[in-house]
Amino acid sequence: MSDPAPEIEAPVEAAPVASPPKGKKEKAPKAPKSPKAEKPKSDKPKKPKVAPTHPPVSEMVVNAVTTLKERGGSSLIAIKKFVAAQYKVDVEKLVPFIKKFLKSSVAKGTLLQAKGKGASGSFKLPPAAKKVEKKPKKVPSTPKPKTTKPKRVTGEKKVVKKPAAKKPEAKKATKAAKPATKKVVAKPASKKAAAPKPKAAKPAAKKPEAKKATKAAAKKPVAKPVAKKPAAKPAKKPAAKKAK
């Protein structure tokens, strides 16, 4: 038998290299950004703020309404005239601020709008605001702590006067002691005079017994039937009958 013929391998074709998709280009790596050079600051001097020569708009408007004191309220034209004459400012520049304040003050209740709507019309202060303005005037008249110190000084003076008043009390005590000594001297004299009385008291005690005997004797002769002598009258009556 013959040997089988060796198989011949077919050459392997290389796979086609994938082509990059169209439209997408590979981005090159960005170079690091260099730090920006700082711009030199301008050394220009700042303009100083000019201080306003007039008070705030709210204060000017409220002052205008309070000084005008119109019953129906002050109009926008009257407020503008007052501000221009009182504060000497360009009112036309302040008109938008005045209108804004009038609207906000009506919403808050600081001003009352008597007529019109918005910034047009007439405005006046509410009655409650007038009372609040009057109250702070009465507050500064209450300095009371000064009155506490002089009271202590007067109390010390009274304490000094009390020991001086004790001298007349000592004189009274000496005067009262003198009559007390006189009474003590009078008492032994009365005891000596009273000493002989108890000796005579014993015979005197017998006298009341004699008086009692005399009283009893006086009572005995008083006979009650003697007082009944008027009972003899009925005896006279039968004698009168015999005469008839």
From Swiss-Prot:
Under Pfam families, the record lists: Linker_histone
The alphabetical list of record keywords is:
Chromosome, DNA-binding, Nucleus
A Gene Ontology molecular function term for this protein is: structural constituent of chromatin
Chief location bin: nucleus
Domain (H15) spans 53-127
What function does this protein fulfil?
Answer: Histones H1 are necessary for the condensation of nucleosome chains into higher-order structures.
Which protein are we looking at?
A: Histone H1, orphon
User: What is the protein's species of origin?
Assistant: Chironomus thummi thummi
